[in-house]
Structures are given as C-alpha cells and as structure tokens.
C-alpha cells in the first residue's frame, strides 16, 4: 500500500484500485439466512413415482405429490410463482446454432428481479397481461444471470421455462444462455445469493445448490442450456469471446457439451481439470470476459475477431451499462442494462438487421453509444 500512497497521477492509481477491488470481492461473505420467507416456490423434484413440489408459504413448507398426466405434470400455484406450470419430460441439450430469423429480442442479467422483467416484456408485447407468450414466431434470448441478488429468482426461472414451451408452440423460440452466476450458484459459491433463498434452503433441508440439483426440474433444464448461441450472423453469450478462445466458437457444440457436463461440479474440480479450466477462467472464459469494454481490444481487433468467426456482431451481458449500448461500430452490443438494481431495464431488438432498444415505458430508441472504460 505505500506504493499506492506515493502515486501522483490519477491514472497511476488504477492498479491499486484493481488490487483493492480484488481484495473486496474475495472478502465478500455469504449472507445470513433471512428470518422469514413470505412466499417462494415451487421447487419441483423428480422422484421414482413422478414429481414432488414444495413451496414456502408464510415461512412454512407446503408439499404436494404431483400425478403425471401422460408425459406432462401440472403444478398449480400455492404461493410464490403465480401461474400454473406444465412440467415436461427432461430434454436433451438443444441445438445452439440456428439460421437467421427476422426478429430477435434479447435481455440479460435479470438477477432475481422478476417483476421488473415482466413489466419490460409486457411493455413491448413479448408477453400479454396474463404473462403468456405473445411474440408469435419471433425469438427471445436471455443471456444469463437469473440467479443472485434479487428476491424473485424462482419466479423468473419458471417464467422462462413456461415461455419456452409457449413460444415453441407458436413457431417462435426462447433461448437461455448460461451466465457466470448460474455457474457460481451451482458450484456452491453463494456470496451473492439473496438471504431469502438461504432461508428457503434451510426450511427445505437442502443446500441452495441442491434445490437446483440433477433431480430438480429447473436444475435439469439448466444443465441442458448452452453457454453460447448463434443465430444467423449474431453470437449470443454472457461474457464474451477472448481472442485466444476463438476455437471455442468454432467448436461450439463441443464447448456447450463440456460446460453442461461440468455444471454443478465442485469449483476446484472444474478449474483444475485441463478440459474445463479455461472454460471457467475468471478473466477470459465466455462467462467472465470483459475485454470489449476495458480497452484490451480496439475496434480493428474486434473487427478482425468477427471476421475470423464470420459474424456481424456479438451480443453479451455481464458488464453492466445504464442502457443497451453499442461498441466498436455495432459489432459488440452490451445488453446488461442494470436490471440488477431493480429500478430500470431495457431490451435489445434486432429486426432484419436493424438494432434498437426498448424502454420500460414501451418506447423504442437507437442504441446508446457505449464508452470504453465503463465497467462493472
């Protein structure tokens, strides 16, 4: 620290600030469980006889054994998520490369703010007043990070789970791409978990990651989600692709399969194994990379990267912005619009190659011009 005190130029403080930030992050502790949970659930688990569902209602557990009806199971709400849920049989990992589609809507980093997400999707007629899919044959992409921070993680996951079914029936699609917070929670890094969920886990007699284990419906769903998704000439992922990792995009199917196989494994194990270490690297992996925004790459380097991958643009979350923003001549689009703060948020629209952002009041504007160095 003496070296920091002797620095005279403001820009020279940057390494020290990074050191302080790293110390602060590593020192963050898991919160104590909340004293009371008003409403949470359902948590639906696969059993030998079908499904079991559990809710926390007024800090008490409600259990239901759910009979199957053919291939599906219906879950009627008790508290928590307010809509009925149709549980489908587990699906194998879906294809993560699709042809171009005329209309794509994208959002990321919901972080437990279900109510805000619903307001945003309703404002742009992605869902109707009953929170059901109303975008026809269009596509919705959610670029990671439903877990952590906010108090409505469970509701957000079930909304996306149901919308995926409804969109498919209408000829559209909903895609969820894994973020770093999905990885963190499932390998038991609980530093950002809302205290509500630690209380829910306590009442249900499971660890929080076990509520999303391989025997849970949402846990199974998460384990079949990709870490990167290509639609036409647009790549969607949570963090970004570092120049040294272009082969991960070229071998996208193998990359996604490796991630999916590693979801829920202990952190030390995935970071030590040669085939997964760089996929979980805290600086350069697809779920953590921030190099498009901190000056590591200039526009010429970004252009070269996209040319090698035959892409028009890369759409990422992870790095928080005040608005959906464009960088490097519309080649990098940052869609983490700080929904995590629970106050505002925006959607990205890609319509026949034209880009715009949708605001909470239902209006549309051009993308904001991003500023290099703005990083969270």
Identify the meaning behind each predicted range.
Residues 26-376:
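Feature recognizes metal-dependent phosphohydrolase scaffolds
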Residues 8-17:
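Sec-dependent signal peptide recognition
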Residues 1-8:
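N-terminal secretory signal peptides that target proteins for export/translocation
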Residues 17-26:
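Hydrophobic h-region of N-terminal signal peptides that target proteins for export
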């Amino acid at each position: 620290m003496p070296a920091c005190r002797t620095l005279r130029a403001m820009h020279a403080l940057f390494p020290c600030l990074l050191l302080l930030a790293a110390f602060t992050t590593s020192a963050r502790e898991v919160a104590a469980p909340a004293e009371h949970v008003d409403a949470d659930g359902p948590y639906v688990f696969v059993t030998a006889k079908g499904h079991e569902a559990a809710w926390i209602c007024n800090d008490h557990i409600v259990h239901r054994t759910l009979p199957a009806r053919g291939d599906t199971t219906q879950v009627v709400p008790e508290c928590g998520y307010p809509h009925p849920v149709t549980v489908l049989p587990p699906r194998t990992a879906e294809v993560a490369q699709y042809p171009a589609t005329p209309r794509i809507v994208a959002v990321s980093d919901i972080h437990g703010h279900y109510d805000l997400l619903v307001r945003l999707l309703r404002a742009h007629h992605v869902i109707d007043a009953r929170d059901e899919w109303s975008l026809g044959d269009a596509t919705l992409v959610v670029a990671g990070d439903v877990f952590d921070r906010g108090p409505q993680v469970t509701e957000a996951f079930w909304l996306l789970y149901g919308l995926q079914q409804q969109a498919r029936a209408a000829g559209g699609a909903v895609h969820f791409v894994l973020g770093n917070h999905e990885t963190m929670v499932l390998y038991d890094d609980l530093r950002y978990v809302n205290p509500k969920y630690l209380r829910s886990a306590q009442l249900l007699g499971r660890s929080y990651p076990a509520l999303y284990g391989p025997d849970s419906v949402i846990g199974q769903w998460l384990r079949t989600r990709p870490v990167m998704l290509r639609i036409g000439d647009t790549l969607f992922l949570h963090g970004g692709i570092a120049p040294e990792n272009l082969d991960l995009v070229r071998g996208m199917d193998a990359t996604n399969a490796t991630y999916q196989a590693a979801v829920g494994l202990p952190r030390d194990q995935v970071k030590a194994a040669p085939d997964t270490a760089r996929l979980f690297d805290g600086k350069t992996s697809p779920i953590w990379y921030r190099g498009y925004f901190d000056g590591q790459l200039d526009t010429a380097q970004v252009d070269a990267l996209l040319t090698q991958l035959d892409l028009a643009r890369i759409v990422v979350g992870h790095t928080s912005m005040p608005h959906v923003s464009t960088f490097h001549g519309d080649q990098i689009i940052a869609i983490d619009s700080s929904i995590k703060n629970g106050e505002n948020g925006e959607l990205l629209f890609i319509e026949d190659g034209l880009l715009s952002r949708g605001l909470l009041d239902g209006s549309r504007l051009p993308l904001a011009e991003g500023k290099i160095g703005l990083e969270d």
